[in-house]
């Protein structure tokens, strides 16, 4: 489908069962593959990103079977992939590319990792430099600091590692998941401010489910004790994706509600669950249980503009940018520098598409300032999505004010293949 025309809808109301979290799904797949024992994974996200991880693990010799009831049985390889030479194509899946780079660098094998052109523009130099500190031999095949990569057999000498924290938390997460494979004590020191800290906390939580503990001092120093090995918990469930919840919760706040999402709530280990704090600041009515959240429009009807630090919700923060179109006043989103190195340059892309709708936008290195138009949004705008799933999902919210065309709606397959069907269900429109 080249485009999707969304009609103007008056109200959003209903319940949505969330797909599994992308971030948790790919972490659990990798840890299950590295563990001793067999793991049965339920509610795994079925998407392009998780498909890339599944394909890669199978190429590396991991036995993975999808059962008739939609679960995945992963036979762990006790920390050593059977296949020692492979070429892996990982699309634009950062949650597969970064941790696999770290793990494969310790495997004493010969591997090539590549992706789509955009992945080759996304920096990985800080992770490569950190791995080289302990003896890894990694060649950047086109431009230093960027994929594609070639990994060679190497003598690994675990010890202290320093890594920058200001580009992507996935670099640190990859190191944390990989280094227990050495069996040696390792200390990782983060230089500068660590962005997206909740995603690191998420990594540590998943590692604990497989029996490996990480000690930390603030967000600057992480210690991995010696002689730890991953052990299967037997059965493990993936909680619903909190980033994906943001679109439906936003719809409820914009267009009446109530909209309830099921599969993530107050017990969630995901940082993006804090999106509800921004909704509350905008005046939305929020209620929450252990595994559900419900949103509705403010009692007065109109959302308020906010000035919000988005460091803890880098993905869900994109939803706030489109919500700003419905708020009174100027909304400022801060600490979003990581948007520049995501599936597209999200600061530039979001700025361009918001302007098509009549918004006034000021963009900086790490912030966006958005003022909605004085009158109605521009109807029938054609929104480009830049092969970025979150751009497509964010701008679906525009239909709560005016008709809108979304180009390349199929890009949502990266994390949420049936998103538009779920959106149509709560807006009571045909799809």
Swiss-Prot record:
Gene3D superfamilies: Enolpyruvate transferase domain (3.65.10.10). One of its GO terms (cellular component) is cytoplasm. This is 3-phosphoshikimate 1-carboxyvinyltransferase. The gene is aroA. The active site is at residue 315. Belongs to the EPSP synthase family. Pfam families: EPSP_synthase. It comes from Nitrosomonas europaea (strain ATCC 19718 / CIP 103999 / KCTC 2705 / NBRC 14298). It is found in: Cytoplasm. It is an enzyme of class 2 (transferase).
């Amino acid at each position: 489908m080249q485009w999707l025309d969304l009609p103007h809808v008056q109200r959003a109301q209903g319940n949505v069962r969330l797909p599994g979290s992308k971030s948790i799904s790919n972490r659990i797949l990798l840890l299950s593959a590295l563990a001793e024992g067999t793991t049965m994974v339920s509610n795994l996200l079925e998407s392009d990103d998780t498909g890339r991880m599944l394909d890669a693990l199978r190429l590396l010799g991991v036995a993975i079977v999808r059962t008739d009831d939609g679960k995945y049985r992963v036979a762990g390889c006790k920390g050593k992939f059977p296949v020692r030479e492979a070429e892996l194509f990982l699309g634009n899946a950062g949650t597969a590319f970064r941790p696999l780079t770290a793990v494969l660098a310790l495997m004493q094998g010969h591997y090539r990792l590549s992706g789509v052109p955009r992945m080759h523009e996304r920096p990985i130099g800080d992770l490569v430099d950190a791995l080289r500190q302990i003896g890894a031999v990694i060649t950047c095949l086109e431009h230093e600091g960027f994929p594609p990569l070639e990994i060679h057999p190497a003598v690994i000498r675990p010890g202290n590692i320093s890594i920058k924290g200001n580009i992507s938390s996935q670099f640190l997460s990859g190191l944390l998941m990989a280094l227990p494979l050495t069996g040696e004590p390792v200390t990782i020191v983060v230089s500068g401010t660590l962005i997206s800290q909740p995603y690191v906390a998420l990594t540590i939580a998943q590692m604990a489910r497989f029996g490996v503990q990480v000690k930390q001092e603030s967000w600057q120093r992480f210690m991995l004790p010696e002689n730890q090995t991953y052990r299967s918990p037997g059965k493990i469930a993936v909680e619903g994706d909190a980033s994906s919840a943001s679109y439906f919760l936003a719809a409820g706040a914009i267009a009446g509600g109530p909209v309830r999402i099921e599969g993530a709530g107050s017990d969630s280990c995901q940082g993006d669950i804090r999106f509800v704090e921004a909704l509350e600041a905008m005046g939305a009515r929020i209620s929450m249980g252990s595994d559900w959240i419900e949103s509705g429009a403010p009692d007065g009807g109109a959302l308020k503009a906010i000035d919000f630090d988005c460091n803890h919700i880098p993905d869900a923060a994109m939803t706030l940018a489109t919500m700003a179109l419905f708020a009174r006043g100027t909304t400022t989103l801060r600490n979003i520098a990581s948007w520049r190195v995501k599936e597209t340059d999200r600061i530039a892309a979001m700025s361009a598409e918001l302007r098509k709708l009549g918004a006034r936008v000021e963009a900086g290195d790490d912030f966006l300032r958005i003022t909605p138009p004085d009158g109605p949004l521009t109807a029938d705008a054609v929104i480009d999505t830049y092969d970025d799933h979150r751009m497509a999902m964010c701008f679906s919210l525009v239909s709560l004010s005016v008709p809108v065309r979304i180009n390349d709606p199929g890009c949502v397959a990266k994390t949420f293949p049936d998103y538009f069907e779920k959106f149509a269900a709560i807006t009571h429109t045909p799809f």
